Amino acid sequence: MRGITLLACFTSVFADGNDPRDFDSDLLMPGFHFVPFPWDWQNDPNGPMWDPVHEKYHLFYQYQTPRMWGHAVSDDLVDWVQLPMALKREHWYDQGGDFSGSATVLDDDASTVVLTVSSSDNTEIFVALPEDRSDPYLTNWTLPDYNPIYTTDARDPTEIMKTSKGTYRIADGTAVGTEIWEVNAFEDIFTNDTWTKIGTFQSNDGGAYWECPDVFPLPGAEEANLWVSKYSRSGDHYYLGMYDEDAATFTPLERYEGNPKTYDHGPFYASKTFLDKKDDASRRVLWGWQRMDKPEDTWQGQTQGVPREVKALPVTGSNKVDESPFYLTNFPIKELETLRDEDSHVANALPGGAQSFEIHDDEPVLLDAVSGRMLDMKFDIDYLNDGAQACGIRVLWTPGSDEYTDVLIDQRWVRYRATKNIGCWHHHHCFHSPRFPRLSVKQERKNYLANSHIFICLHSITTHRFAPYSLALTENNVGTDVNFRVLVDSSIIEVFINFGEETQTLFSYPTTSTSVSVGLIGAHCVFHSFESWNMNPYQFDASLVM
């Protein structure tokens, strides 16, 4: 009965007038990426969590300047109710800001929910508790008098983790890596004299702070004791390795030593996962902050990426090497598909409704059956020969103009160059895929500013990083297909290659409402099974803060 009552509550608040978004006047406003209201700065997704008592998802995030904690709640990780701020700089230790941390539902009865928070000067770690645990929204939070629980030169504490021995641990980020603090009993969590630093989970020899650490067993690889150690520093990077609970240490797999992988090769940062136990399922859901390089005056171009499921997939065949038969993927959660407009579904979107379509030159081919500012598309590409260079799709396109964004896989060795008429900058991003190591994602967009061009390439470089996976297009593997999932949301594009084996967030800045067309582009490749949907915006109720 509780589920029915809460659903009725959500239905009533999603009434006309409670959603402040205006998609007609703001061409860049995303429809299915979370943006908080009132419009203001947001960044790190501090404390995503599932509350089993009230059957709600919560999202906490860095909000405004100086930083405080914003808060929203959902039944399904798709539609959201905006709540008042959870933390608002009310004590001596958080006057400079309530900076990043995590949320934890403690113990089997789930009676206790704790926010772990860091201070602006990276010295104080403190906790917050809900004022009323019976409130299904957990609207109001309090900072107990025993705060801060410990003082250290660290930041961004993780959730509180219970060990097999019944002790409780927190990991936080430091200039020398990820450190571990521990208390022996549940009641000791809520004191300021029992937390003890027990060691360094993983060392960082670079001397730069590891921000927003995340530590968790990789779903699907638990029997192999395969864990993820993630940190944020000029991107969100992770290692796969072995966790020794007794020693509280992490040892990366040999192929990851000194060479972490990356969740997303675009502006995706300060990510945080949580264990989702809804419907007795145990999945790991990933949130990440996406920051535009062209901030908006209203919502400031700061969004959260779509929630993604993190899990292991097996490495098969000749690519199975070293200690682990698994690799990590991150891919949109299934619930996102509820926003698909089924009336707009095109099962065979290629020209003529064909299952396959071959292109041989670089002239774009318009897809008459697909158009829109908010789209979900999936398709495969085969590369025909070693003359195949870059193949992909053109989106947010006004045919006959320079208003478009190309999302391409480029199998050549390419370099990265970006030029704007407001300055010039150069950068390199590298990834090496276990199955397609010489493929790269390239984006070209010509709509940032008038007469400006931006070329973005993810590229592989000659390296021994993953030498056992070396692959080139030869007579033996021509025809190997690459799977795409592309989400377009007005100004945000998320690209998932091979079901989340590699991902990239991109931004585009259309200037006209006619930039809605989609096309194929490339040479010497074949597109297969192109399927598309227009997407509906999520339901957003901001009435509690209006």
Region spans (language model):
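Acidic/proline-rich low-complexity IDRs
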Residues: 5-6, 76, 105, 366, ...
